[in-house]
Amino acid sequence: MLAFVAGLGLSMLSYPVHAAPASGSDTVQGLFDALLVTMKHGRTLGQSGRFAQLAPVIRRSFDTASMARLSVGPTWTGLSEAQRQEVSESIGRYMSAIYADRFDSYEGQKLEVTGEQPVASGVMVKSRIIKANGEPVKVDYMMRRNGEGWLISDVYLDSAISEVATRRSEFAAILKNDGIDGLISALNRKADVLTGTTARSF
C-alpha cells in the first residue's frame, strides 16, 4: 500500500504551468523548469518514470515535425502524411528518451537562460548549463513562431554543433539502407533501450 501511495505521488509531480509562451525565452525557461523538477526526483522516478514525465514537455516545447523534416532531408518529400507523422513521433520519442537519460538526477546543476537575439528564421535563445562541478556549457536554441507561441527547431551545443545536422548525418545511412520504415524502427528501438518502454503514440 505504501509503495502504491509513493508511486501515486510521483505520478502527480507538480510541474510549472505556463501559458502560451510569449517569447522564445519563455519556451526554453519552461523546458528548464520541467527538467529541474524531474532531475530532483530523478532517482526515485527511474528512467521510464523520467521519460513519462518529460515526453509531454518535449512535445509542447519542440517543433518535432520541422526537426524531422530537416533531419530526414530529401526523403521527406516522398513520404505520405502518415509516414511524416510517424517519423515525427518517433523522433520526439527518441528525444524524450535522451533527455530522460541525460538529466537523470540533481546535484546542484543550474539551467539558465541568458538572453535572446533575433535571427533570419526566428530568434536564438542563449543559455548555459552549469554542471555540478561548476563547468559551464553553452546551449543555444533556435526558435520558430508557431501560432501564438514559440517552439524549439534546433539546438546548438557550444554555439556550433547543430542537433538537426547531427541527426541528419546519423539518419542518412539508415535511410539509404533501410528506408523510412527502418529509421522509424531504429529510433523506437533506441528509445525502448533507453527507457525500458515500448513504442506507442508520442
Residue ranges and their predicted role:
Residues 21-99:
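Early exported N-terminus immediately downstream of N-terminal targeting peptides
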Residues 22-23, 37, 41-45, 49, ...:
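Surface-exposed, polar/charged faces of alpha-helical domains
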Residues 156-202:
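Low-complexity, intrinsically disordered terminal/linker segments enriched in charged
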Residues 14-16:
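N-terminal signal peptide c-region/cleavage motif recognized by signal peptidases
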Residues 94-137, 187-202:
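Surface-exposed, charged secondary-structure patches
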